[in-house]
Amino acid sequence: MQDAITAILNRYDLTGRYLDKTAVGQLESFFSSGLDRIKIAEIINDQATNILKEAAAQLYEEQPELLRPGGNSYTTRRYAACLRDIEYYLRYASYALVSGSTNILDQRVLNGLKDTYNSLSVPVAPTVRSIQLLQEIIEEELDLQSIKRTDIIQEPFQHLINALSEQDL
């Protein structure tokens, strides 16, 4: 896992350069958003169970066919696996949010996901929708708590959504 600071420093170290205005600006941006990142991570941590329940409820309300015979969440085992995956997306997105880098999402979530989902015949559309729902629910909570930095929350979730949408699962 690599955070935003390490990524910037590594990039400059590899080219043997001192930090220029661009690098300093990136570091300033990361540090200025630090308290908001921590507050958002705390909200996610404190409300993870409710966020997950709400996302699952909305997903299955929108797509009830997933719970019917033949659906990808039909049977207790498949339903539990779906909820577990949604929890993984939330947890790893919170790590990416705090680190200011989507690197962990690539390493721990996205790499190998295509093969896994293909082997299990898991459709990508409900997965993408569940990630969108997680983002929307968190953004609503941030609005209630007067935290305006939605760009911070959008970055990891949009990275997951874009990467999954690009894959031919």
Curated annotation (Swiss-Prot):
Keyword Transferase found: no
Topological relation to the membrane, as annotated: Peripheral membrane protein
Keyword Electron transport: yes
InterPro entries xrefs: Allophycocyanin_b, Globin-like_sf, Phycobilisome_asu/bsu, Phycobilisome_asu/bsu_sf
Compartment(s) of residence: Plastid, Chloroplast thylakoid membrane
Keywords recorded for this protein, A-Z: Antenna complex, Bile pigment, Chloroplast, Chromophore, Electron transport, Membrane, Methylation, Photosynthesis, Phycobilisome, Plastid, Thylakoid, Transport
SUPFAM superfamilies in the record: Globin-like
Binding of (2R,3E)-phycocyanobilin, residues: C82
Record-linked Gene3D superfamilies: Phycocyanins
Modified residues (N4-methylasparagine): N72
Any single GO BP term: photosynthesis
Annotated Gene Ontology cellular component terms: chloroplast thylakoid membrane; phycobilisome
Signal sequence bounds: none
Description of post-translational modifications: Contains one covalently linked bilin chromophore.
Family of this protein: Belongs to the phycobiliprotein family.
UniProt subunit comment: Heterodimer of an alpha and a beta chain.
Function: Light-harvesting photosynthetic bile pigment-protein from the phycobiliprotein complex. Allophycocyanin has a maximum absorption at approximately 650 nanometers.
Protein name: Allophycocyanin subunit beta-18
Organism field: Pyropia yezoensis (Susabi-nori)
Gene for this chain: apcF
